[in-house]
């Protein structure tokens, strides 16, 4: 029973960590990265397609991305999707290829990005603490229903707190690395 509680806690918190990781992966660091365009959705063929489903994205150098659109008839829509993503990017079309020269980040932009990172991190921490609260309430009910003993309850409580602390440390560690990356490039 306790192993199930522990596994459930870890699984739910892992999903939160992965979501946080995906959020910060899309934040620019001053270096070209294909993941910068991961969240872009293109309106084509009467529906929505992720950019990586209609084009190949590659890094040419530290400041340049190349997007090879597989269907030349949708190059304009891909360009518009990039422009509408509010990433402060200026795509240039060259046939079926779109090149993006990444502008240097100003200090003001860097500070805004760091604020955004902190917001993502705080949202992830809140989600982790909410998961802890939910699991603790579940465990409390199990104790009240005599499904687990008092000792098991206290052991589970301690274990859940340790898992929570570990996951918050992971969030803070990833935040610190990404923050340094933004401020030092």
Curated annotation (Swiss-Prot):
Protein family (similarity comment): Belongs to the RRF family.
UniProt KW keywords: Cytoplasm, Protein biosynthesis
Q: Which Pfam families match?
A: RRF (PF01765)
Checking HAMAP family in the record gives: RRF
- Kindly state a single biological-process term from the GO annotations of this entry: cytoplasmic translational termination
What is the protein's given name?
Ribosome-recycling factor
Location(s) in or outside the cell:
Cytoplasm
Q: Which InterPro entries match?
A: Ribosome_recyc_fac, Ribosome_recyc_fac_dom, RRF_sf
Q: Which gene is this protein's source?
A: frr
- Give a GO cellular-component term: cytosol
Q: Name one GO molecular function term.
A: ribosomal large subunit binding
